[in-house]
UniProtKB/Swiss-Prot annotation:
Antifungal activity. Inhibits mycelial growth of F.cinera, F.oxysporum, M.arachidicola and P.piricola. Lacks protease, ribonuclease, deoxyribonuclease and hemagglutinating activity. This is Alveolarin. It comes from the Eukaryota. Transmembrane segments: none annotated.
Length: 9
């Protein structure tokens, strides 16, 4: 959402 690992994965 804001640039987290889960967001990019």
């Amino acid at each position: 959402g804001v640039c987290d690992m889960a967001d990019l994965a």
